[in-house]
């Protein structure tokens, strides 16, 4: 694995710099920008009302936040709304500019805290993939600001299981991750990551499967979805080097979040401080986060047994957030659970 990565990094170093032109993502559900912060735009998908806000903490890993609002019948935002959650917001993380290269995990947690305060000081928090780890850290740091917590496909206890991603993180030396940052002059360029991480497969059958499309693969509807997915997948975002190295070392190599050695905004956090309702949603065939790496949170948080819900669905990682069947059935159930908290 290390020798293969070394060859890939050498190939990247010898190649051309990634194109810095940003293509504006397309959103499916009408929204407005409610807040502009250094790390994000806060997008409001609110239908009005006085209900408690639900904040979707999108992944900050490789792709933009339109993962949460991909297409009709493939939108997490729309699924939450249709199930009765009126005030839905999404963290639309910015692609890292050169000026953002020193942004850290704390930089993002600080902006997340500003958002929660803006939403009234207490919110439902839905953490998706890497955003789930951030959401859990935030919930442990500010437990009184969380009404209900949902973690979906989120890495919590890396040593509780094994996935393709965690195998890579454990096998690659820290110097390899640092070299990737150096190639981007202090940032990790999304185009570089895309060349190194070739998941999921982009064959039509694989995309059709993760989207859980009922139509035949040859229909115009399926063809449009395939094109939309490829456009989204080949539009990666850049990451701050400091943040990227902290995630690689602290969360994956050191497993600090699960072992009580993770510091957030000035002090160590303890996951047992998370004592409210929590829903853990895992994918059976997840190549990014093994179900055990997420479901281990059940024994780490301080919530009472009756407040903890878990579910494992038969899909891949992206199928958790983009799959039509999962959104229609599982996420509508989660939304009703949140509304009843």
What are these regions (language model features)?
Residues 274, 280-282, 286:
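Short beta-strand/loop motif that positions the catalytic acidic residue
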Residues 126-135:
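Gly/Ala-rich beta-loop-alpha elbow adjacent to hydrolase catalytic centers
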Residues 125-127, 152, 281:
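Short beta-strand immediately N-terminal to the catalytic nucleophile in serine-hydrolase-like folds
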Residues 1-4, 120-121, 134-242:
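Alpha/beta-hydrolase-fold enzymes
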Residues 20, 27-97:
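Short, surface-exposed "cap/lid" segments of acyl-processing enzymes
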Residues 287-293:
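Conserved alpha/beta-hydrolase "acid-adjacent" motif
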Residues 288, 310, 314-329:
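Catalytic histidine-centered segment of alpha/beta-hydrolase-like enzymes
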Residues 100-118:
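Alpha/beta-hydrolase active-site loop
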């Amino acid at each position: 694995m290390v020798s293969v990565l070394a060859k890939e990094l050498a190939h990247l170093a010898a190649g051309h710099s990634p194109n810095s032109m940003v293509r504006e993502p397309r959103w499916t559900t009408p929204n407005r920008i409610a807040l502009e912060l250094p790390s994000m735009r806060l997008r409001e998908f609110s239908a009005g009302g006085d209900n408690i806000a639900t904040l979707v903490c999108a992944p900050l890993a490789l792709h933009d936040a339109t993962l949460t609002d991909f297409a009709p019948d493939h939108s997490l935002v729309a699924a939450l709304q249709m199930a009765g959650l009126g005030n839905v917001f999404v963290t639309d993380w910015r692609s890292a500019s050169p000026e953002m290269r020193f942004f850290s995990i704390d930089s993002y947690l600080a902006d997340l805290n500003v958002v929660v305060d803006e939403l009234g000081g207490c919110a439902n928090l839905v953490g998706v993939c890497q955003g789930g780890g951030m959401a859990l850290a935030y919930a442990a740091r500010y437990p009184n600001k969380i009404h209900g917590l949902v973690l979906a496909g989120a890495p919590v206890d890396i040593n509780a299981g094994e996935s393709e991603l965690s195998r890579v993180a454990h096998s690659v030396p820290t110097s390899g991750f640092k070299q990737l940052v150096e190639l981007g002059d202090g940032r990790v360029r999304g185009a570089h990551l895309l060349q190194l991480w070739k998941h999921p497969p982009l064959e039509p059958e694989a995309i059709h499967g993760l989207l859980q499309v009922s139509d035949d693969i040859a229909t115009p509807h399926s063809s449009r979805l395939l094109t939309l997915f490829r456009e989204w997948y080949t539009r990666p975002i850049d990451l701050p080097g400091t943040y990227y190295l902290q995630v690689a070392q602290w969360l994956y190599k050191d497993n600090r979040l699960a072992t009580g050695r993770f510091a957030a905004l000035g002090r160590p956090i303890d996951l047992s401080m998370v004592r409210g309702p929590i829903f853990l949603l895992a994918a059976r065939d997840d190549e990014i986060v093994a179900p055990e790496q997420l479901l281990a949170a059940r024994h780490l948080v301080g919530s009472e047994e009756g407040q903890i819900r878990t579910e494992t669905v038969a899909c891949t990682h992206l199928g958790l957030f983009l799959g039509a069947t999962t959104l229609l059935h599982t996420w509508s159930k989660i939304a009703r659970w949140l509304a009843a908290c």
